[in-house]
């Protein structure tokens, strides 16, 4: 199958917009708890009426600052409650939200401010505010900087005070003037291959995304469910899911404190979470390592295989009597503990940003947590394809979100069009023209659609490795397999214009400690100290051999190199959503790559 379309069971009207739902909820269900926010470490209820009042006050404050419809307003902050309130306020006055990751460098912030010509910026912390102040001479359009937290006056309080003298009728008029074709947000791409481009999304794009998600997931996105958002709201996935949840009256909480995520999950008790595959891989690998450290590695291995078998059997008419009995035993011994780590009530998750892997998907479903994989980009308002609760094929990213179409080009590239697809790049006609072909957006990803209409992503077009022998290799297949090993943190497949495929491997710091203990290694030894240790080499070699089973002999990894350090966002090898920056890795570890191909 080369093309598939899914019609929308809804319409988007001329004046439909994202902010309208804030005041609809206030009118229809004022006392319902739509948010919970952390105040002094306690999750505190926020009703629809309270949220609407805060958003209204912030919007009036923006009007008092002279923010006009179409003006760009930056949120430079980690994920937190105020992020969502400010976003809705910006949209309500007809302005355009411009997110910046809280980890961005001064040069990245400068470029976004200069290119977008933002007039107001919300800085989260003292350090964010200081960075922006130091850039003030090079960003003349920026008139106002307000601080969300830290030592400065609170941004929401300042807006409330400033907007007290503004007639509420002015906000009513702004809302009435909004059209679905109006710009809503400007999201800057990661810029791994040059200057970041501003991706323009309209109110219509976001409304299509929100309504499409609800159409596919009426049992996840419904009143009474609970969602804890911990991915960066600057990333389109977290923001789109948060908006869809708000629309469906899911109670939403926010945190950026990843180090204390498990205790927060235990208290918040979400029924659904949204994350990237690396988090699900990490949870699995940690559970496997903890079992191994406790001398129960064999039990966990059998439990994991039973979960996979049970899930696969569900796709073939259901598990038999013996498998059901085994599954029940391991549910008490293993799976229940895994669910408890996520708060005890979590029954489903949404995964996006990278492929999850079929085995991991089956494991989690078998353990009682169904993961619905999706696919999308900033240019598609988040998900353009997603697995459905009643139409799931693990290992795929599902079917098009209603109102959208997918096509596989002759060279295997995935093309998309429809309600969620963006209108173009900000002030960059050349890039916009290059991004489309006959009205279809060129995603840059390689994919396939099976006979049932399910989409599978096989890699990035620009990441395809062409060996010296002319063999095309998609690195993601091997890398996903390698990251499934509990001792491996990251893997980068190399071999462009080389005689064979190689790999750079980093070791998971937490798993490494347990491995040293089980293998009688010196407690204080670092990965660098043991990078050539025969036992460590043997363990990674076994993982490489297992990964190679997923590809042909010509595509298989012949040699690998263990790096002395792991990749992190702080050291520059990872994006805020934990994707590897291949160009950075290739430059930083050029000598290690060369060593793979040096003749011994």
From Swiss-Prot:
Any one GO MF annotation of this record: long-chain fatty acid-CoA ligase activity
User: Could you tell me which SUPFAM superfamilies the record lists for this protein?
Assistant: Acetyl-CoA synthetase-like
Cite the InterPro entries for this sequence: AMP-bd_C_sf, AMP-binding_CS, AMP-dep_synth/lig_dom, ANL_N_sf
Pfam families membership: AMP-binding, AMP-binding_C_3
Q: Name one GO biological process term.
A: fatty acid biosynthetic process
EC code(s) of this entry:
6.2.1.3
* Family annotation (PROSITE patterns): AMP_BINDING
Listed under GO cellular component are: membrane
Task: Give the matching Gene3D superfamilies.
Answer: 3.30.300.30, N-terminal domain of ligase-like
Task: Show the catalytic activity.
Answer: a long-chain fatty acid + ATP + CoA = a long-chain fatty acyl-CoA + AMP + diphosphate
> Which EC class is this protein assigned?
ligase
Q: In which pathway does it act?
A: Lipid metabolism; fatty acid biosynthesis
Keyword vocabulary terms for this entry: ATP-binding, Fatty acid metabolism, Ligase, Lipid metabolism, Nucleotide-binding
**Family from the record:** Belongs to the ATP-dependent AMP-binding enzyme family.
The name on file for this protein is Long-chain-fatty-acid--CoA ligase FadD15
């Amino acid at each position: 199958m080369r093309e598939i379309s899914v019609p929308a069971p809804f319409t988007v009207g001329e004046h439909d917009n994202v902010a309208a739902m804030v005041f609809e909820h206030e009118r229809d269900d004022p006392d319902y708890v739509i948010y919970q926010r952390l105040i002094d470490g306690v999750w505190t209820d926020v009703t629809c009426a309270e949220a609407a009042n805060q958003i209204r006050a912030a919007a009036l404050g923006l009007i008092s600052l002279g923010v006009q419809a179409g003006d760009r307003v930056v949120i430079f902050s980690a994920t937190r409650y105020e992020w969502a309130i400010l976003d809705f306020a910006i949209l309500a006055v007809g302005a355009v939200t411009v997110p910046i990751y809280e980890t961005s460098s001064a040069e990245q912030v400068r470029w976004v401010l200069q290119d977008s010509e933002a007039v107001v910026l919300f800085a989260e912390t003292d350090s964010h505010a200081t960075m922006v102040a130091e850039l003030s001479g090079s960003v003349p359009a920026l008139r106002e900087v307000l601080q969300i937290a830290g030592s400065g006056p609170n941004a929401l309080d300042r807006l409330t005070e400033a907007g007290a003298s503004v007639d509420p009728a002015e906000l009513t008029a702004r809302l009435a003037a909004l059209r679905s074709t109006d710009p809503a947000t400007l999201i800057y791409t990661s810029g791994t291959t040059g200057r970041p481009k501003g991706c323009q999304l309209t109110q219509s794009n976001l409304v299509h995304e929100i309504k499409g998600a609800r159409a596919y997931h009426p049992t996840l996105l419904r009143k009474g469910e609970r969602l804890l958002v911990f991915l960066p709201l600057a990333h389109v996935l977290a923001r789109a899911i948060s908006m869809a949840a708000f629309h469906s009256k899911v109670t939403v909480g926010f945190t950026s404190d990843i180090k204390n995520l498990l205790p927060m999950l235990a208290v918040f008790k979400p029924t659904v979470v949204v994350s990237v595959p690396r988090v699900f891989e990490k949870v699995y690998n940690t559970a496997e390592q903890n079992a191994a450290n406790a001398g129960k590695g064999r039990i966990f291995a059998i439990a994991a295989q039973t979960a996979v078998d049970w899930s696969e059997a569900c796709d073939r008419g259901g598990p038999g009597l013996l498998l059901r009995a085994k599954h029940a035993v391991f549910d008490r011994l293993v799976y229940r503990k895994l669910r408890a780590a996520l708060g005890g009530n979590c029954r489903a998750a949404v995964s996006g940003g990278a492929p999850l892997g079929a085995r991991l998907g089956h494991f989690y479903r078998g353990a009682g947590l169904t993961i619905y994989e999706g696919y999308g980009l900033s240019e598609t308002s988040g998900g353009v394809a997603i697995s459905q609760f009643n139409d799931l094929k693990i290992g795929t990213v599902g079917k098009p979100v209603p109102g959208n179409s997918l096509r596989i080009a002759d060279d295997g590239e995935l093309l998309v069009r429809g309600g969620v697809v963006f209108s173009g790049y900000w002030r960059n006609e050349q890039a916009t023209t290059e991004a489309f072909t006959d009205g279809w957006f060129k995603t840059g990803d390689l994919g396939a659609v099976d006979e049932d209409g399910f989409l599978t992503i096989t890699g990035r077009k620009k990441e395809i490795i062409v060996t010296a022998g002319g063999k095309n290799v998609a690195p993601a297949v091997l890398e996903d397999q390698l990251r499934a090993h509990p001792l491996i943190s990251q893997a980068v497949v190399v071999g462009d214009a080389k005689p064979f495929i190689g790999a750079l491997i980093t070791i998971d710091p937490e798993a490494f400690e347990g491995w040293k203990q089980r293998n009688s290694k010196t407690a204080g030894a670092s990965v660098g100290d043991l990078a050539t240790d025969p036992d460590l080499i043997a363990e990674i070699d076994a993982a490489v051999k297992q990964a190679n089973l997923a590809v042909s002999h010509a595509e298989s990894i012949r040699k690998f190199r263990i790096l002395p350090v792991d990749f992190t966002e702080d050291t520059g090898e990872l994006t805020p959503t934990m994707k590897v920056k291949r160009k950075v890795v290739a430059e930083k570890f050029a000598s290690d790559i060369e060593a793979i191909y040096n003749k011994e």
